[in-house]
Amino acid sequence: MATKCGNCGPGYSTPLEAMKGPREEIVYLPCIYRNTGTEAPDYLATVDVDPKSPQYCQVIHRLPMPNLKDELHHSGWNTCSSCFGDSTKSRTKLVLPSLISSRIYVVDVGSEPRAPKLHKVIEPKDIHAKCELAFLHTSHCLASGEVMISSLGDVKGNGKGGFVLLDGETFEVKGTWERPGGAAPLGYDFWYQPRHNVMISTEWAAPNVLRDGFNPADVEAGLYGSHLYVWDWQRHEIVQTLSLKDGLIPLEIRFLHNPDAAQGFVGCALSSTIQRFYKNEGGTWSVEKVIQVPPKKVKGWLLPEMPGLITDILLSLDDRFLYFSNWLHGDLRQYDISDPQRPRLTGQLFLGGSIVKGGPVQVLEDEELKSQPEPLVVKGKRVAGGPQMIQLSLDGKRLYITTSLYSAWDKQFYPDLIREGSVMLQVDVDTVKGGLKLNPNFLVDFGKEPLGPALAHELRYPGGDCSSDIWI
């Protein structure tokens, strides 16, 4: 799916060229059975999203992993637009790190895109021996041809934000990207911008803290992250630590797609803020809060105040719109970021959540809403959970949404999700004036899977997307 040229590698030459790419016809997403009561392996689902297809909105293939309780989570590619100039590279393998087992699965999606098959399994012992890292999260492909995967911890479940390097051809474990002893205290997501010789990583919590659920006392004890780590891209070492004001649990991080840009955004889940990070004239980096989702005072919930819980953010490929999900409040938002210092709300849509009418939670005080939103029913299915992982079409006109965050937190905050399974929804985007509208004809119900209700997570398109590809 590369731009047509005589001697191109994978992906597209620029983010704006990517916007001209073909419409998505299938998507890949991991489905999780850990913590659901179903003793079955996680699997990679292939879903038909072509409205002209007779199999539209159907799971057309399932690839089960050979082990139980891996907790598949995010995925990345063997190569992407960072290797566009290398015609020897081809985007044919999807790399799936396991959040809990620390196993890495490499899946062949090139031979038969509609029927992926397992290519290689990298066992935890190989990663432990060469890297002393575990609990793996984000996978990004590098221009060097390597694959880089972030970690949350060490083998014992203590916090350790390091990076596993894989050979992009053989998928052998090469070691760590960071220098020996140079890991961050905690880890989660990362994004790099080579033209500014920088990578920035985020942090969730130590695996031992989050593995079995959320305990508010752990927040009081300072066990959850509130920093960004600025790395020298060439020297592979931390050069600055940014402390976030109102920035508890910084998760997904996105630089602007323009490789010349020296700024981006991070979503801070528990504080429910969007923070803008940027490079100063002297070469150091700073951060400022640009969006705050106010908490709601509630009755009948875990705490007296409910945060929005921003769990995923995306930037459109033209760097015009920012999207994020409030998993607990239940709304999906669109902001115009033409002026990155002053994002402007242009679209908001409620897709379930914890404050719907008729539910166990009563909202006592709300700075934003006059009444609690209606429950979401799509094609006769009442949707459990709230909007979580989001993926945008290349042209920016369609958003796909799944409702599961992480099995242990799903079980705690949305027990209905465990019983009924997650769903995949699609939202139409107005890219002229701004605005979001649910497609009432689109529903993939993972509650009806053959082995029982499953928890579907992050989406990927075969040709890359706005959270998998980095331009250099």
Swiss-Prot record:
Topological type in the membrane: Peripheral membrane protein
GO biological process: protein transport
Enzyme class: oxidoreductase
GO MF annotation terms: methanethiol oxidase activity; selenium binding
One annotated Gene Ontology cellular component of this protein: membrane
Record has Nucleotidyltransferase as a keyword: no
Catalytic reaction equation(s): methanethiol + O2 + H2O = hydrogen sulfide + formaldehyde + H2O2 + H(+)
EC number, as in UniProt: 1.8.3.4
Pfam families tied to this protein: SBP56
Major localisation: nucleus
Superkingdom to which the source organism belongs: Eukaryota
Subcellular location: Nucleus; Cytoplasm, Cytosol; Membrane
Keywords assigned by UniProt, alphabetized: Acetylation, Cytoplasm, Disease variant, Membrane, Nucleus, Oxidoreductase, Phosphoprotein, Protein transport, Selenium, Transport
Tissue spec: Widely expressed. Highly expressed in liver, lung, colon, prostate, kidney and pancreas. In brain, present both in neurons and glia (at protein level). Down-regulated in lung adenocarcinoma, colorectal carcinoma and ovarian cancer. Two-fold up-regulated in brain and blood from schizophrenia patients.
Modified sites of kind N-acetylalanine: A2
Triggers of expression: Down-regulated by androgen in prostate cancer cells.
PTM description: Phosphorylated.
Residues with the Phosphoserine modification: S111, S371, S467
InterPro entries (alphabetical): Se-bd (IPR008826)
Function: Catalyzes the oxidation of methanethiol, an organosulfur compound known to be produced in substantial amounts by gut bacteria. Selenium-binding protein which may be involved in the sensing of reactive xenobiotics in the cytoplasm. May be involved in intra-Golgi protein transport.
Subunit structure: Interacts with USP33.
Record family assignment: Belongs to the selenium-binding protein family.
Disease involvement: Extraoral halitosis due to methanethiol oxidase deficiency: An autosomal recessive malodor condition characterized by extraoral blood-borne halitosis resulting from the accumulation of sulfur-containing metabolites. In extraoral blood-borne halitosis, malodorant compounds are carried to the lungs, where they enter the breath.
Annotated protein name in UniProt: Methanethiol oxidase
Lineage: Eukaryota, Metazoa, Chordata, Craniata, Vertebrata
Gene label: SELENBP1
